[in-house]
Curated annotation (Swiss-Prot):
Pfam families noted in UniProt: MMR_HSR1, MnmE_helical, TrmE_N
Cofactor(s) demanded: K(+)
Protein name as it appears in the record: tRNA modification GTPase MnmE
Sequence positions that bind GTP: 230-235, 249-255, 274-277
UniProt-annotated binding residues for Mg(2+): S234, T255
Coiled coil: none
Positions with a binding annotation for K(+): N230, T249, I251, T254
Cofactor comment: Binds 1 potassium ion per subunit.
One term of GO molecular function: GTPase activity
UniProt keyword annotation of DNA repair present: no
Role this protein plays: Exhibits a very high intrinsic GTPase hydrolysis rate. Involved in the addition of a carboxymethylaminomethyl (cmnm) group at the wobble position (U34) of certain tRNAs, forming tRNA-cmnm(5)s(2)U34.
Gene name, Swiss-Prot/TrEMBL: mnmE
Keyword Lyase: no
Coarse class of the protein's main subcellular location: cytoplasm
């Protein structure tokens, strides 16, 4: 497959030590060589790096002092010739280098176009390409490991084996239908077909079992911190983040808006949402914050309900407990450094089997126990991202769910005595749906849409 030559800045814009301009295409080396003063880049070996200068051909002025990496096809990310120009960081110089390259007839790359070419040229499949963006966006080491495993093709291999099983079954059915007189081919009975289809459905279900945890590692747990004013919600946020993000005072109603922050809790990314204290108030601004707090609470995956150890439970406290019933929540009884006034038996009763943890955030007590409780709640205490193939992408989860339903329809049809040749339709559709995960059967418009979400230069 032939493409034109493209270029883009591959590093984040702004001041920094190094900025990289990436160029990919059949004549990438020749185009860069025109503006490079140093060794003749067309003569140097692949996978080598060379010192020199970028020159403006119109003025013969030296623009940048650079190191240029030469990587020749097919042993490159895009399977095309790639040149990477390492220049000084900053906005002006790197943009000037890019403009000089574009002036040589090179096109500015679209977002994700380098990765798209890697996919279209067969270096990676679609699930591996999507994992590139997951790696860039990973917020914890665990999330990074999941993305790397997918980039290395773990999910692709699982899907490939399932598609191969279905294909072999379809081929067997075809032979039985078209050549019934062949005695050397085993007859595809309804029982054999059910066995093979049931195996595929079980494998799909097994992959989907990891989807909840995989999605958490990829996107994080949306965690709302709720409670009455001045019970320690902002202190809890600061303790988990380990820096002061929220204002902490003795004045009730200090937090009037929603504060969001990502934090790594034992390998699990938490999207912490510190909400305004929930209470009846005449303050218009605070009342808006309270309404937003209730909205965030309803949308959260996990709710941390904070109550005050040194005060008796109020009607507002009990209303919060009723509001979180049916959700995953943990109760934090804070301020244990003060004399006890709260009825702990009533707290445990209201928690309805959910964890209750006592803390003194001012003395930094109880945070480790809270972090363990969160990991236990979502991962049963262990996250084995090294050995488990997590499916975390919403598109993949949707397609696997759809494939599971379609193969289920095939099994139901077989059990109801539908002719085997009619069952082929559901088997073929399952094979096609699974192929959409790896990009083998995906529509071109979807490919364009997926890669448009990538950052420029990737």
């Amino acid at each position: 497959m032939e493409f034109d030559t493209i270029a883009a800045i591959s590093t984040a814009l702004g001041e920094g030590a190094i900025a990289i301009v990436r160029v990919s295409g059949d004549d990438a080396v020749e185009k860069v060589n025109r503006i490079f003063k140093g060794k003749d880049l067309t003569e140097v070996p692949s996978h080598t790096i060379h010192y020199g200068h970028i020159v403006d051909l119109d003025t013969n002025q030296v623009i940048e002092e650079v190191m240029v990496s030469i990587m020749r096809a097919p042993r490159t990310f895009t399977r095309e010739n790639i040149v990477e120009i390492n220049c000084h960081g900053g906005l002006v110089s790197v943009n000037k280098v890019l403009q000089l390259i574009l002036a040589q007839g090179v096109r500015l790359a679209e977002p994700g176009e380098f990765t798209k070419r890697a996919f279209l040229n067969g270096r990676i499949d679609l699930s591996q390409a999507e994992a590139v963006m997951d790696l860039i966006r990973a917020k914890t080491d665990r999330a990074m490991n999941v993305a790397i495993n997918q980039m290395e093709g773990r999910l692709s291999k699982l899907i490939g084996r399932l598609r191969q099983d279905i294909l072999e079954t379809l081929a067997h059915v075809e032979v039985n239908i078209d050549y019934p007189e062949y005695d050397d081919v085993e007859e595809m009975t309804h029982n054999i077909l059910i066995e093979k289809a049931t195996h595929v459905r079980a494998e799909i279900a097994k992959i989907l079992e990891t989807s909840k945890q995989g999605k958490i590692l990829r996107e994080g747990i949306a965690t709302a911190i709720i409670g009455r004013p001045n019970v320690g919600k902002s202190s809890l946020l600061n303790s988990l983040v380990q820096e002061k993000k929220a204002i902490v005072t003795d004045i009730a109603g200090t937090t009037r808006d929603v504060i969001e922050e990502y934090v790594n809790v034992r390998g699990v990314p938490l999207k912490l949402i510190d909400t305004a204290g929930i209470r009846e108030t005449e303050d218009v601004v605070e009342r808006i914050g309270v309404e937003r707090s209730k909205e965030m609470m309803s949308q959260a995956d996990l709710v941390l309900v904070v109550v005050n150890y040194s005060e008796t439970l109020t009607n507002e406290d009990e209303e919060l407990f009723r509001a979180v019933q049916g959700k995953d929540f943990i109760v934090i009884v804070n301020k244990t450094d003060l004399p006890q006034a709260i009825d702990m038996e009533r707290v445990i009763e209201l928690a309805a089997g959910n964890r209750v943890i006592t803390t003194s955030l001012i003395e930094e007590q109880g945070i480790d126990e809270l972090e363990k409780a969160i990991a236990d709640l979502f991962f049963e205490g262990t996250i084995d991202s090294a050995d488990v193939t997590y499916v975390s992408n919403a598109r993949h989860i949707g397609l696997l769910t759809q494939a599971g339903k379609t193969i289920g329809d095939a099994i139901e049809a077989i059990e109801n005595g539908v002719p085997i040749d009619m069952v082929q339709i559901d088997l073929t559709r399952t094979w096609e749906i699974l192929g959409e995960i790896t990009g083998d059967t995906v529509h071109e418009s979807l490919i364009d849409q997926l890669f448009s979400q990538f950052c420029l230069g990737k």
